[in-house]
Regions:
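Alpha-helical membrane segments and immediately flanking helix-loop junctions
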Residues: 56-88, 114-132, 136, 150-153, ...
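Extracellular/periplasmic helix-exit of transmembrane alpha-helices
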Residues: 111-118, 220-238, 246, 250-253, ...
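Helix-loop-helix module between adjacent transmembrane segments
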Residues: 27, 31-32, 100-125, 131-195, ...
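Flexible loop linkers connecting adjacent transmembrane helices
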Residues: 37-61, 84-86, 90-94, 98, ...
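N-terminal alpha-helical transmembrane segments of multi-pass membrane transport
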Residues: 1-76, 86-93, 104, 396, ...
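Membrane-interface loop-to-helix entry segments
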Residues: 23-30, 34-47, 166-172, 179-240, ...
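Transmembrane helix-loop junctions in multi-pass membrane proteins
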Residues: 3, 35-39, 77-82, 158-168, ...
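Select transmembrane alpha-helical segments in multipass membrane proteins
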Residues: 21-26, 61-69, 141-155, 185-186, ...
Length: 449
């Protein structure tokens, strides 16, 4: 097992080297400029996300699609992932993670647009879409579309399943002394009860769960920052300065480098918001929407909530707590978050427990849908039920697995998904601009396709 972990560590290091960082950030920046900074429409996007298009075609509402995407996106990457980035890359990783989210809004917009533009309608009226359909229908590259689908089906077991199940089991054991085997069995049953109902069941549960969990977590983080108010200025300075000058972090962070801060900040940023990975467009394609741009805007709002708000708050809580309480061990990402939050009496530990349990479970639900659609693309509908059984079983396995192995596997799969998806976005940018001009720039958002 250690040999496999060492191998995955090497592969992850290669995949997340400078070429990948340049490709991902380059795509974010290119689309930001090409689409005239779609970030400026973020509040319009938020308003659209709570509106319904009842006369539009699709399987779920725009909010249902967004809630499912957010459920899959807001997971341990927002809590443990941020802490791991800080432990490995220093406080500067928070800034890189945040920047990945800000510029990633443009990429998430582009993904959502292509999801609607290239989606297909099955014989039973179900909408299917995502990067695999964009690669096949937009570029004619079915071979690359199949590769993306395979990577997605496998990635679901990493970022969407075992990582999340492991986090739930760890929290349950450390907080309440519950055996990982018992936790794994319970989460298996809960997952099966929801995912067997299909996308509408998943969207319904996520639509109820996401607003509640996000509200309480954000409110709790704001309270902790209020308690740490005297250290916020120092935390901001440390995050910004150490992103470009690691020596500015001082203390135990001095071993980090700019490359490490960028690599782990960007990698965990992608893990957190999934902009450029190609996962969210799979459920965006099922949305009821009048035109591609409306759903593109709704999709982009997910990255704003996930990284610009939640990840930034988590990073500030951790860094300000480390400054306020120098005895915190920040060398281990898995324990850093718990140590930072536990320093806040009454609120810290319950908030972390609530956040990890709800965020992780919702991610398991959302990623099951992604994996199913990927399998359906390259193997056919008849394989979906078997995939569900394996996926639900993997929840139990993930509960008792080695965490380091799980994270390395997830990093590898994330990168392998992102590469073909980013290629499709760059090659099809002309279509993205054309649709944006047609509906957004000319003020025709209410016009149907």
């Amino acid at each position: 097992m250690q040999c496999l972990n060492d191998f995955l560590t090497e592969v992850s290091g290669l995949l997340w080297g400078w070429p990948m960082i340049i490709l991902l950030l380059g795509t974010h920046l290119f689309l930001t400029i090409r689409l005239r900074f779609p970030q400026r429409h973020i509040f319009k996007a938020i308003r659209l996300s709570v509106k319904r298009d009842p006369d539009a075609t699709g399987d779920v509402s725009q909010f249902g699609a967004l809630a499912t995407a957010l459920a899959a996106t807001i997971g341990t990457g927002n809590i443990i992932g941020v802490a791991t980035a800080i432990a490995l890359g220093g406080p500067g990783a928070v800034l890189w993670c945040w920047l990945t989210g800000v510029f990633g809004i443009a990429t998430k917009y582009a993904e959502g647009l292509l999801a609607i533009k290239c989606r297909v309608k099955t014989k039973n009226g179900k909408m299917l879409g995502g990067p695999m359909y964009a690669l096949e229908r937009g570029l004619g590259w079915r071979w690359l579309a199949i590769l993306f689908a395979v990577f997605t089906a496998l990635a679901a077991f990493g970022i969407g399943n075992t990582v999340q199940a492991n986090a739930i089991a760890t929290v349950a054991q450390e907080s309440y002394g519950v055996s990982p085997y018992i936790t794994g069995a319970i989460v298996c049953l809960l997952t099966g009860a929801v995912v067997l109902g299909g996308v509408k069941s998943i969207a319904r549960v996520c639509g109820m769960l996401v607003p509640v969990m996000a509200f309480f977590y954000v409110a709790g983080c704001v309270y902790i920052l209020f308690v740490n108010a005297d250290y916020l200025g120092a935390a901001f300075r440390m995050i910004v300065l150490s992103a470009f000058s690691p020596e500015a972090a001082g203390g135990g962070f001095v071993g980090s480098t700019v490359m490490m801060a960028a690599r782990f900040g960007i990698a965990r940023g992608l893990f957190s918001n999934e902009s450029g990975m190609g996962s969210a467009p799979i459920v965006a394609a099922a949305a009821q929407t009048k035109n591609p741009v409306r759903q593109a805007l709704v999709s982009s709002s997910g990255t704003f909530w996930d990284t610009v708000v939640i990840c930034a708050l988590t990073g500030l809580v951790i860094v300000s707590s480390v400054i306020a309480y120098p005895d915190i061990d920040f060398s281990n990402g898995a324990t850093l978050t718990k140590a930072a939050f536990s320093k806040i009496p009454y609120v810290g530990t319950p908030l972390l427990t609530f956040g990890l349990l709800t965020f992780s479970f919702s991610t398991i639900l959302g990623w099951c849908y992604y994996g199913e659609r990927a399998v359906e693309y390259f193997k056919g509908r008849q394989w979906v039920k078997g995939y569900r059984v394996i996926y639900i079983t993997a929840v139990f396995v993930g509960s008792v697995m080695n965490l380091a192995l799980v994270w390395n596997l997830a990093d590898c799969m994330n990168a392998l998904m992102a590469i073909p998806n980013l290629i499709s976005l760059l090659c099809l940018n002309g279509i993205i601009v054309h649709e944006t001009r047609k509906y957004l720039w000319k003020g025709r958002l209410d016009k149907a396709m």
